[in-house]
Amino acid sequence: MLQKTVLLLALVAQVLMLENGLLRTPPMGWLAWERFRCNINCEEDPKNCISERLFMEMADRLAQDGWRDLGYVYLNIDDCWIGGRDATGRLIPDPKRFPHGIAFLADYAHSLGLKLGIYEDMGKMTCMGYPGTTLDKVELDAATFAEWKVDMLKLDGCYSTPKERAEGYPKMAAALNATGRPIAFSCSWPAYEGGLPPKVNYTEVAGTCNLWRNYKDIQDSWKSVLSILDWFVKHQDILQPVSGPGHWNDPDMLLIGNFGLSFDESRAQMALWTVLAAPLFMSTDLRTISPQNIDILQNPLLIKINQDPLGIQGRLIFKSKSHIEVFKRNLSDDASALVFFSRRTDMPYHFHCSLLELNYPKGSVYEGQNVFTGDIISGLHPETNFTVIINPSGVVMWYLYPVKGLGIYTMMSQL
C-alpha cells in the first residue's frame, strides 16, 4: 500500500514541476570534474588539463566510440574554465586554455551531434575560486551562455548564503527561459541546504531545475558510493515523489573507468544508479577506458531501463538478514527492474527468494533477462522459488515483464 501511495504522489507531484520540455528522461553524457578536477597545468600535463583540447578529444570519443548513439550526448565543462570578466562584465574563458572560446566548443560539439554543458556558481566565487554568478549578474550570464549556444548549465552553490540561493536559483531559471534557447538547468541548491525538508522545498526546486544534487560530492571510492546510496535509501519516501520526466534527483557522477571501484563495484554503481532513475554522467578518460568498463557503461538493456519514459525512481523494497538488499523500479508496460545487491564482503552468496516475497501479484507469469549476463528468464511464477548468486559488493540485475495467458513455466534455477 505504501508503494502505491508513493507512486500516486509521484504522479501528482509531476503536475507541479518545471516544464521547459527538456530532459524527459535522465540526461546522459560526460562530465569533467571527477576524473580531471581543476588540473590547469597545461604546460606540465597538456593532455589532461582543463582545456579546449581535452573537451574536443572527449567529444571525438563520444561521437566515434558508440557513446552518442546510445544516448551519452552531453559534453559538460565543470569548474576552472573561467578567465575572468571583461570590461562589460561578461564572462570570458581562460584565453590560453580555451583560445577559441566556448562558442567554438559548442559548435564543435553540435557538429558531432552532441550538446555542450557549462558550469557556474550561485555565489561570489566558484568552488575553486573563479568568478561566480552574483545576483546582479544572473541575466547577463544567462544571455552569455545562450549566445554561446550552450545546452546545459550546472549552477553550484559555493560562497553563497541560503537567502542568495533562494533568490538566485529561481532567478537563473527564469533568465535561462527568457533567452529563448533550450538550456537544461542542473542545480546544486538542495545539497547546500542539507538535502531535506523543511530547509528544502522540493516542489519549488522541481519547479526551478531539471536536475539537482541532493547530497555530498562523490569521490573515487566504494565508501563514497555507499554513503550516497544509503542517504538516498534512508530518504526515499521524500525523494521518489519529486523525481520524474523533466526533473531528476542526481546522486552524482559515475566512477566507472577510474581507480576506486572493482569490477563488481562498477557494475553495482551502474545498476543502482539506473534503478534510481539517475542522470548517467560518466567522468572518466574515454581515450583510455578499458573494454570491460565500456561494456558496463554501454550495456543497452541498462540504458533502456534508465531511459524508461515513465521516469519512476526505484526504491529499496527488501532487506535480508544475510545483508542482501533488493531494489525495484517500475517501468513502462508493466515491466520492472530488480537489483539484488550484496553488502557482504566474504564470498559469493546464494540468495533464495520468490517474486511473491517481493510483492509481485499472484496470477501473472514473468519473462525477462539477466541484464549483465544476457541469460533468459522464462515462465517465472511469483510463487516459484529462485536462487541468484551475488558476488561481494556486487549485483545481479533482472529485467522482467508479465506474459499473459502462459499456463506452464520453465526456468533456470540459478541465474
Swiss-Prot record:
Keywords: Disulfide bond, Glycoprotein, Glycosidase, Hydrolase, Lipid metabolism, Lysosome, Phosphoprotein, Signal. Its main location: other. The active site is at D156, D217. Pfam families: Melibiase_2, Melibiase_2_C. GO terms for cellular component: cytoplasm; lysosome; membrane. CDD domains: GH27. The modification Phosphoserine is found at S322, S332. Gene3D superfamilies: Aldolase class I, Golgi alpha-mannosidase II. PROSITE patterns: ALPHA_GALACTOSIDASE. Glycans are attached at N177, N201, N330, N385. Disulfide bonds join C38-C80, C42-C49, C127-C158, C187-C209. It catalyses: Cleavage of non-reducing alpha-(1->3)-N-acetylgalactosamine residues from human blood group A and AB mucin glycoproteins, Forssman hapten and blood group A lacto series glycolipids; a neolactoside IV(3)-alpha-GalNAc,IV(2)-alpha-Fuc-nLc4Cer(d18:1(4E)) + H2O = a neolactoside IV(2)-alpha-Fuc-nLc4Cer(d18:1(4E)) + N-acetyl-alpha-D-galactosamine; a neolactoside IV(3)-alpha-GalNAc,IV(2)-alpha-Fuc-nLc4Cer(d18:0) + H2O = a neolactoside IV(2)-alpha-Fuc-nLc4Cer(d18:0) + N-acetyl-alpha-D-galactosamine; a globoside IV3GalNAc-Gb4Cer + H2O = N-acetyl-alpha-D-galactosamine + a globoside Gb4Cer. InterPro entries: Aldolase_TIM, Glyco_hydro_27, Glyco_hydro_27/36_CS, Glyco_hydro_b, Glycoside_hydrolase_SF, Melibiase/NAGA_C. One of its GO terms (biological process) is carbohydrate catabolic process. Its EC number is 3.2.1.49. It is found in: Lysosome. PANTHER family: ALPHA-GALACTOSIDASE/ALPHA-N-ACETYLGALACTOSAMINIDASE, ALPHA-N-ACETYLGALACTOSAMINIDASE. Belongs to the glycosyl hydrolase 27 family. Homodimer. This is Alpha-N-acetylgalactosaminidase. It comes from Rattus norvegicus.
